[in-house]
């Protein structure tokens, strides 16, 4: 029978049909090879937008720098970065006038955070530029290396464990005439193997000391490493993103803390909240504009797009904003916050790996590192690359490029949002002093502008006024990419608004399915995704039930764990059938052991082990939850884990799921090949670091402690905590006298060992 597809939508309101327009099946594109070209594009574009600025030379590093601030006012619609200081300051003043006390209160909150933040805050985050090794490392390792180098150079304020003291060391390090660092290198030598008597290559890891003079150290401290942004859909060209080093990160964190605190108090800000909270906040602004417009008024909404937001922002402007926001605050506080924008005004971008050349005829490949781009003959390059290199050469210093204007992606999201909101704030009637007025939403570079006016001419005038006001602070609304609609239909940060926010369930489709971590985590993540979509994305009960059945099917095929009584033959079916036959209570078997699925849409919030615990045979319970099971290398047992789920659009989201550790929570062993490389020492450091942190977290579960602000080592803190806990447990009868005595003895032994050390 032929079905007329339009019949499917007869009962569906038009806005719900958005889920049928889903374009993102298949894998997103990933980048291969070097990011050097993309980084050069970014640098060249940024300088082009600011080309009418003033050139100066940095006295410390010798880097040429372009300063577009207070440059010529724009005469055309081309994007430009010539922000006017007095306009930015005035926008800040009006923002404060509309929100009395907002800056004052946020400063007080930030000061409290600064006093309490521990240096381990910097271990969060993934790849970080490690200036000691001149390449990317996991954040924890990069921090450990930095602190190690600081201490060996006599900088010891960081030993208190407070982030602010570590930052004191950073500032002091910049005044030192030289810094001594340790670098890793590999030695290969041929030796005879005793067993096989064959010659083998033996690799040993050497460490050598290297001295950096003041200039070289400063260049490294101000360097952002660049990579290509992966998995970006809907783009033909890739683009570069930056990862800053440890010297910059701490200062940026405090600036963003202040800006976040301000954003929380601004109703037009789409940051730092997300999800349903964000939708509610935005719906409020729309409602306000609708109710305040008179019946005769027109109301239009612009779904806005800005041209190259980051590349037209300027750190000097952020410095002006911070100077204004903190104007009545103590000197130390103002200094700490102004360092991040100053460092960004003097930043250097690392060009990455360089170019790879290959000769088809001679089957030769050779890498041209970024350091060589300054001197190499350009005849080897094609025309577009040649142009890029010519443009960039005056800015090159040791394989890094001086990049004073522009911000690089994702560095000051909160602070740039404050700037955007300050322009939206100027749309009130008392500031426009005419018949049109505006309000809107801002989230980093994304915005929606709601304009009310008595007639179309008023709307047009309002758009023009908004556009020009933005230009004055270095924001370039793109007239080509923004579109205007009657209020009631617009898009903002991938939320579609049509008389209320529409649930675009198809955006979540890529996160359905089996994640491939391990049997235990995959089951938990799978049902949590379905549960979350029922809560947040209008996933109806029938569809959810179907999604669940498809997921279980997918899961069984992935792990070859079809029910014990099935006819399907796989590698595992022999073992699973045997287990099925010898199990009395078959309902108690986990799905991954060939058991039945007991999930339905009512019990998705219960981990499978808990759901089936009462139904399990006793010996099965014993095998399943046995920490001594020799076949399993256990993950640390946490009650909640974090999974990374990929929506179709926007950044990967972190999602919490319940983790019950069983023999199914295995982790694959690490690839051995890393153990023979120069990375090995780093890997061991990282594991030790991880173990210490895990141990510490065991003593201070995050629910029960505010991190110690006093100056005590991790060991001292854990010992004192153990003593307190033991006493409480002993007095309440939870532990016996002998156990209490044993704990006290262990604590004393640890202290004794520390004293001897």
UniProtKB/Swiss-Prot annotation:
Residue ranges of domain RdRp catalytic in the record: 286-483
Transmembrane segments: none
EC id: 2.7.7.48
Motif (Nuclear localization signal) on chain: 187-195, 203-216
An annotated GO cellular component: host cell cytoplasm
Signal sequence coordinates: none
Record-level Gene Ontology MF annotations: nucleotide binding; RNA binding; RNA-directed RNA polymerase activity
Primary enzyme class: transferase
PTM description: Phosphorylated by host PRKCA.
Principal subcellular localization: host cell
Subcellular location: Host nucleus; Host cytoplasm
Catalytic activity: RNA(n) + a ribonucleoside 5'-triphosphate = RNA(n+1) + diphosphate
Keyword Ligase tagged: no
GO biological process: DNA-templated transcription; symbiont-mediated suppression of host gene expression; symbiont-mediated suppression of host mRNA transcription via inhibition of RNA polymerase II activity; viral RNA genome replication; viral transcription
Promoter-binding site as annotated region, ranges: 249-256
The entry's keywords: Eukaryotic host gene expression shutoff by virus, Eukaryotic host transcription shutoff by virus, Host cytoplasm, Host gene expression shutoff by virus, Host nucleus, Host-virus interaction, Inhibition of host RNA polymerase II by virus, Nucleotide-binding, Nucleotidyltransferase, Phosphoprotein, RNA-directed RNA polymerase, Transferase, Viral RNA replication, Viral transcription
Polar residues bias (residue ranges): 55-64
Stretch list, region Disordered: 50-82
Quaternary structure and interacting proteins, as annotated: Influenza RNA polymerase is composed of three subunits: PB1, PB2 and PA. Interacts (via N-terminus) with PA (via C-terminus). Interacts (via C-terminus) with PB2 (via N-terminus); this interaction is essential for transcription initiation.
General function of this protein: RNA-dependent RNA polymerase which is responsible for replication and transcription of virus RNA segments. The transcription of viral mRNAs occurs by a unique mechanism called cap-snatching. 5' methylated caps of cellular mRNAs are cleaved after 10-13 nucleotides by PA. In turn, these short capped RNAs are used as primers by PB1 for transcription of viral mRNAs. During virus replication, PB1 initiates RNA synthesis and copy vRNA into complementary RNA (cRNA) which in turn serves as a template for the production of more vRNAs.
Protein name: RNA-directed RNA polymerase catalytic subunit
Gene: PB1
